[in-house]
Amino acid sequence: MFTASKLKVMQLRSYDLFLDLDFQNLQFRGRVLIELESERDVTLNSIGLRILNSRSDGKTLDFEQSGEDLLIKTGPFKGTVEVEYAGSIPDLLVGIYRAPYDGTYMVTTQFEAAHARRMLPCVDHPDYKAEFKLTLKIDKDLDAISNMPIESVEVEDDKKVVSFQKTLRMSTYLLYLGIGRFEEAKERLGDIEVIFATSTGKAGKGQFALEAAKRSLEFYQSYFGISYMLPKVHLITVPEFAAGAMENWGAITFREAALEVDENSGFKTRRRVAEVVAHELAHQWFGNLVTMKWWNDLWLNESFATFMGYKVVDTAYPEWSVWQEFLITEASGAMARDSLKNTHPIEVDIKSPDEIEQIFDEISYGKGACILRMIEAY
C-alpha cells in the first residue's frame, strides 16, 4: 500500500469513466481512461476489481496486482492509460454497494476515506485531484444521479446510456454515483438547483431540508465570498448508510432519518436536520473546493464543518439557541471521549488508509469545533 510520499512522482489530469451496470445481477464492467504524467511506472489503487487489460495508444501494457496496488508497467509516462475491468456490487456499505429497501434496492457509493478504488482503479488520495467524466449504461427504467447534471441520454433497446457533465477538479473520495428509482422535490436559489431525492412516495418529506439547504447556501456564499461552484446540489436519502451523511460534491448523501421531516416531526428532529444539512454544505467549500493534502488534517475538515454548521443554524433559526446545544453535544461529547485511555490528539499521524476510519469521532469533530470557536472568540 503506497503513501503520500510515493505519490509525488505522479500528476493527474482527468478520469474518463464508462460503467456498464447489470442492476439485476449486481455486476458491472468498467473502462477508465486516465490522463496523467508519471516519472516511473504508474501505480493505481484497486480493490475487489478484476483487471482485464491495460493499454495506451492501442499498445497493451503489462500490469501486476499486489494487495490494493495496481502497477502498470509504463516506465516514465505522459499520456492516457486505459484500464478495462469488472466488479460486483456487494452489501459492504463502502465503495459501490447495494442499499435495500421495501423489497427492492438502490445502488449507491460511499468513497470516503479510501474506497473509490472499489469502483475504479484510481489514485485514491485526497491531494491527487482530477476532473471526472462519467458515462453509464443502465436499464432504461432506472434513474441515475452523480456529482454533475446529466449531459445526454441515448436509449439503446432496453438500456440507456447516461452521460454526465465533467466535474471540477476534485478528490476521488468525493465522486458519487446513485442508481435506482428516485422521486425528487426541487427548489431554486438563483442559478443553483437544489434537489431532494428519495425513494418513491417520500418526496414530501424533503421540504424542510430544501429550506435549510437554501438558507445554508445563502449564508456560505456571503460568508466565504465565493459562489457555490456547481449548477446543482442533490440531497439524497440512502436507506442503508453507515455514516450520518457524506459531502460528495454536488450529490450529498444522508441517512433517511437525518434528512426527512414530516408534520409529526418535532423541534429536535428539525434542528438536527438543519445542522446536518449545514455541516455537509460547509464541506462544499471547505473540504471539496479546498482540500487537505492528507488525512492528518481530517480534524480541520470535519471540525470546521461542524463549527460552521452551528453558525448557519444560529443565523437561520435564532430561536433555537443552538450554541447551548453545542455545549451539550459537541463540548461534553468531546470531553467524555477525551477522558478515555484510548483518546488521541485532534491531529493524528495517519500512515495508511486503514487508520483513517478510526479517527471519525468526537475528537476530530467536537473537540476540534470547540477549539475553532475559542479561536474565533480570542
Tell where the protein language model's regions lie, with residue ranges.
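Acidic/His-enriched low-complexity segments
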Residues: 1-232, 257, 360-362
